[in-house]
């Protein structure tokens, strides 16, 4: 019988040099990828997904890692090849798309230059043939205006365009295996859907095998023929995608399917991996009666924040002699925010969500319109006058990695705003307050002296939340606060935000591109597109009967 396997991984083990074999980072990993097959490798951060991918390309540092087992690619054991033999395989036969295209692309070279460089290094083509090949691939990844695109630098194109460029780069040498390591994690759900469809189409047209790595099981199910579930360096379950969804055996697999917010029902609390795995979760559905009662309570009082006809534009200029273009970021925005409400702002990147948040915080000044907070017109205040209101309006950032100062420990990060406003000055009181805040966000006093690099993504975001609530604000703006996190960690952070809202009666402005998350969290939503509010209202009603095509597009993009 003919062997149809392109890649066979047999009993792969990876452990740190000088460590015990009993503490393997990858433990007895075995799987196959057939020719023209898409295999999904799914697990949480730290499960060993990326380590497996790097092992396949033999990119692990021999001084740091020891590997054993076999990785057979076209019947050659990759772990036994020389450097010259490996270099012939990397890029030519096995290619890789990375999670963060901005860090994978060279910021000092334009897109065309980077594509040409790869062709000259790996392919025996003349200049005309190289240009022809690049133009063909750019069309295949569905990018427009090729001539101008090739002149641009990475910072001048969107996240979705960067990822398409990365896909084009990965296909330049006609590989037979494409490893896609979290290629859609940082993207809007609509762009995510487009990239998934693009990979599916290219897999067929280019006769590719694909190893698609992700933390999102619902997303991988839409793409993969076979799914492998990995946890703590070991494979816990694998099988055909549809069978695995319908007949998952391992509690961990079932938990991965359950943590994403439901499109159909609203739960008081999202299931978490830990509770599902320990059979310790009982779903409590928010009934229509209870929801109506809660909404009546919120909207029976006057709003605490009112925005009237806010407009904001930016001037862009491509060169010294080019004419100025005006980009309208916000156009006649009107909204009311009520005490105890969670108001959702949802839309794709560039729709104006974050610009609106910045105008509320007076980081950006609007050109016209009013922002009234508890009777005070914020747009008329000077920077000094606004300081006392900044205590009341706090922000949780999207990226927990860049929002914390790497040189400051957790304790100092949390108490910094408290010291600035001189709420507490005694050192013992400040430390006690930091401990209280850590406990509020589900962390212990053991974290006080840790630095950001010693924390996981979820822990970093909890520290960011602790800092945001340290001043007892009235309004908290959550700007894509969970979009950089695994779906499993997302569920924990969303539960935490709702718990804190109940405890302290916070009012949230919840910004997201993911309508399923917004539906779970919000009492009311505004759908934004190109600086305009397309649609607004009760998210449950909008989900059932959206009025605008753009809203339908966002709903259809949910995995």
Q: What is each PLM-predicted segment?
A:
Residues 129-148, 428-446, 555-556:
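Conserved ABC ATPase "signature" region
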Residues 174, 472:
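Conserved catalytic motifs of ABC-family nucleotide-binding domains
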Residues 220-222, 518-520:
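A short, surface-exposed alpha-helical micro-motif characterized by mixed small hydrophobic
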Residues 238-239, 247, 533-537:
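ABC ATPase "signature
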Residues 152-157, 161, 451-455, 459:
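Conserved ABC ATPase signature
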Residues 65-77, 369-377:
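Conserved ABC transporter NBD signature motif
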